[in-house]
Amino acid sequence: FLKGVFQRITLKDVVVGKNYVLIISTCSGLWSYNIGDTIMFVNLNPYKIIITGRVKHYISAFGEHVISKEVETALEMCLMRFGGEVFSFTVCPNINPENGLPHHDWFIEFIKKPANFSSFCEYLDTSLRKQNIYYNDLVKNNIIRPLVVNCVKVGSFNNYMKSIGKLGGQNKCPLLSNDRKIGDFLSNYLI
C-alpha cells in the first residue's frame, strides 16, 4: 500500500499474519473508503482481525516500512525482559545526524526507567530487527545505525499535545512519524 500498489482482495483470499489496509465498500463495489487502519487476520474460521496500526503512521525514510505493531511489540518485549514502565513514546527518523549514520530516534517518557538501560536499548534494537526484515537489512549493511533511545522529562508528551491543541483523553501522540516535527519538539525535553 505504501508503494502505491493497490490490489483489492476478498475475504476468501486473505492470509493469517499478513497486514492489510481496511477498505469499506458497498456490496456492489461502486464506491469505497479507506478508513485509515491497518489490520491483520488472526483467524479465518470465524474471521477475526486485530488492528495493527494506522496507514499514515509508519516510518519508511530508508525503505524499512516500520509500522506501529512492530515498534509496540519490540517495546513490550523489552519491558517484559528488563522491567520499567512507559508513559508514552514516539519514533522518527534522523536522516542527517550531526555524527555517524542515519538512524531511528526513539523518544520515551518513562514512568519507571529500566535498571539496565544500555541492555534495554540494545535489546530494543534486536527486537525491532526481528519484527522487520527491511530494518534488519539496513542496520546489518551499515546503511543506518541501530536505533537511539532518547529519554524525555515527565510531562513532555503532554506538552507536545498541548502545543498542537490536542491535549485530552480523545487524542494520542502518534507512535511513528516519517518526519522530525514531534522529535524536534521533544528534543527540548531530553534528560
Specify the residue positions occupied by each region the protein language model found:
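Active-site glycine/GP-rich loop and adjacent strand/helix microenvironment
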Residues: 1-191
